[in-house]
Amino acid sequence: MARKLKIDILTLFPEMFDLFNLSMIGRAKKNGIIEINTYNIRDYTIDKHKKTDDYPYGGGAGMVMTPQPIVDSIRSVKESNKGKVIFLGPRGKKFDQEDAKKLADREELIILCGHYEGIDERVYKYIDEEYSLGDFVLTGGEMACIPIVDSICRMIPGVLSKSESYIEESFYSGLLEYPQYTRPEEFEGARVPDVLISGHHENIRKWRRKQALKITKDRRKDLFDKLVMTKEDKKLLNDNEL
């Protein structure tokens, strides 16, 4: 029986995740490979006005998400989901492909999306892991959740059309992806490289590897420096014929 991944998302804006009904993730949901549920944190508040935020103690700009509705939503979801609680916030580890692989190996996940100026510090007692997309400001955790869930789901067997698809993508192998071309062979004077239409599969493989190495070296030196170069890689970088 194929493995299934269940993701429960706690958010103030569940409608933002309707896009998971589209494209490959939508197909995976229909095929029973992935289950994605959204829960509105506002439904768990005991405030008569349905408030989920309040002014910060000590003053300061903005509003802070109150602990009660968040903690109660976590407790409720945990009745049917035993996965770890993942919070998306600025203090978290910068999310990368290795994290996507790790999370894709799990059967259940609970993702908490923050909003406003953040969450009450007392909520962290109920959080297992925290991730950030990078050193920039987003309107809310929902904006980070979408690409993170997408990167996790595409690692699940059966989500992509063929198992090789994600293996050759940028970052999975530690390299940026090689250039891609499609028809026509010539467009406004720019031709597809001859090697790609030669039919020589080994030369095509070498060309793609060389291009990936060059692009990564030029554009992401941080990734290139982490790469364990093979003898072939070193030779390809110095080969002017490919």
UniProtKB/Swiss-Prot annotation:
It holds the Pfam family tRNA_m1G_MT. One of its GO terms (cellular component) is cytosol. It comes from the Bacteria. GO terms for biological process: tRNA N1-guanine methylation. One of its GO terms (molecular function) is tRNA (guanine(37)-N1)-methyltransferase activity. Belongs to the RNA methyltransferase TrmD family. This is tRNA (guanine-N(1)-)-methyltransferase. The gene is trmD.
